[in-house]
Amino acid sequence: MSQHVSRLGGLRGRSHGHGAFGGPYHQRLRRVGRRPRRIAMLSVHTSPLHQPGTGDAGGMNVYIVELAKRLAAIDIEVEIFTRATTGTLPPTVELAPGVLVRHVDAGPYEGLAKEDLPAQLCAFTHGVMGAWAGHRPGYYDLVHSHYWLSGHVGWLAAERWRVPLVHAMHTMAKVKNAALAEGDTPEPAARVIGEEQIVGAADRLIANTEEEADELVRHYGADPELVAVVHPGVNLERFRPADGRAAARARLGLPPDALIPLFAGRIQPLKAPDILLHAVAHLLDEDPRLRERIVVPVVGGPSGSGLAKPERLHKLAARLGVSDVIRFRPPCTQDELADWYRAASVLVMPSYNESFGLVAIEAQACGTPVIAAEVGGLPVAVRDGHSGILVPGHNPADYARELHRLSADPGLLKRLGSGAAHHAERFGWDKAAAATADVYAEAMRGYRRLRSVHG
């Protein structure tokens, strides 16, 4: 019997027969014991203050910021430890009332790739321990780490502070390596081993979806009793239809009657923006008349240090003969991104893997349907035929066909847009924070019980 916290109707279970969880699990997670007063949240490789869509900043940054704010709103103080990336950063920044960001010096400030960060975990851990040393015992009630790098720091911190560790993978090496894009680099064995160690050390694991929970059990041997599913949320105050598509297009200088398939996110093979470019080329070959009324914005920057430009994508657009309809735009603020969502006819997400797909929920909250690959958590984020269209595989011709279908059927596009806004209303950060707080309470109760048994 395994427990899954789900914002979509409380706790959900599925029958797996002899699969990962061995049967249905409908028991409601009991709210027992106290919630933490203050937690240490760890995000080694990317700061919640960074602009999403740049470098390694993306959905995880949004996740941490929104979750921390909502936890603070229910009286759980959050201190976020992250690596300092410039020498001008103050030691601490108040992100919101009850949310403090602590910058930790670990390695050179600039030009350090994520792949080089394992060598800096000792320095980062030293900084975290140094910040804690000035506090009384019991200052933090729990550690919540994000991504495998943070998990290793959290493992040591939780043991030193004698508090439970809650960990969120966000992405997993074994899953990514099983669905690599052409030309993408496999995740190293060191990461796989590191993730296996964290799974064994954590008191609770939070998965974005039931599928991710299954993957934790199937690929990493996680104890099903320690895995909780909490769907991420969306900021429904920021991401909403607002004054509509026409007004958003006017603000962005886009044609009022254009077909606008949008890509928004980091420019990396995993996100597959090249699939969209190939699909657009295929679409224009099939229906050359569309060239006069199609605009394809690609909003985002390259992964890593952010110093490189997405030159390969520019060259691909030129080679495919679609440079005239592609509009490359740099990463933008969350408020500006909301306008891009509203202006778009449809968001296209041909990713090879997504643990959830926050971008899909954000777009739908703005009333924009989504064409997405049927991978990872996207079948949860997108309701096929109601809020968008799920495409099996990554054949550009399949995406071109769906784009053509939407361009030829304004009624369908409108129905999907209405369904998208309705679907997104089910995903709010307040619910996600409440469910996460319940996981914390369970972790603390289990930790206290274990200590009472073992002394």
Curated annotation (Swiss-Prot):
Alphabetically ordered keywords of this record: Glycosyltransferase, Magnesium, Metal-binding, Transferase
InterPro entries: Glyco_trans_1, Glyco_trans_4-like_N, Mycothiol_biosynthesis_MshA
Residues the record lists as binding Mg(2+): 341-342, 344, 368
Gene Ontology MF terms: acetylglucosaminyltransferase activity; D-inositol-3-phosphate glycosyltransferase activity; magnesium ion binding
Catalytic activity: 1D-myo-inositol 3-phosphate + UDP-N-acetyl-alpha-D-glucosamine = 1D-myo-inositol 2-acetamido-2-deoxy-alpha-D-glucopyranoside 3-phosphate + UDP + H(+)
GO biological process, one term: mycothiol biosynthetic process
EC number: 2.4.1.250
The keyword Glycosyltransferase is annotated on this UniProt entry: yes
Metal-binding found in the keyword field: yes
Residues that bind UDP-N-acetyl-alpha-D-glucosamine: 51-52, 59, 266, 271, 354, 362
Binding site for 1D-myo-inositol 3-phosphate: 45, 56-61, 114, 147, 171, 191
Region (Disordered) residue spans: 1-25
NCBIfam families linked to this entry: mycothiol_MshA
Job of this protein: Catalyzes the transfer of a N-acetyl-glucosamine moiety to 1D-myo-inositol 3-phosphate to produce 1D-myo-inositol 2-acetamido-2-deoxy-glucopyranoside 3-phosphate in the mycothiol biosynthesis pathway.
Binding partners and assembly: Homodimer.
HAMAP family xrefs: MshA
Entry similarity comment: Belongs to the glycosyltransferase group 1 family. MshA subfamily.
Protein name: D-inositol 3-phosphate glycosyltransferase
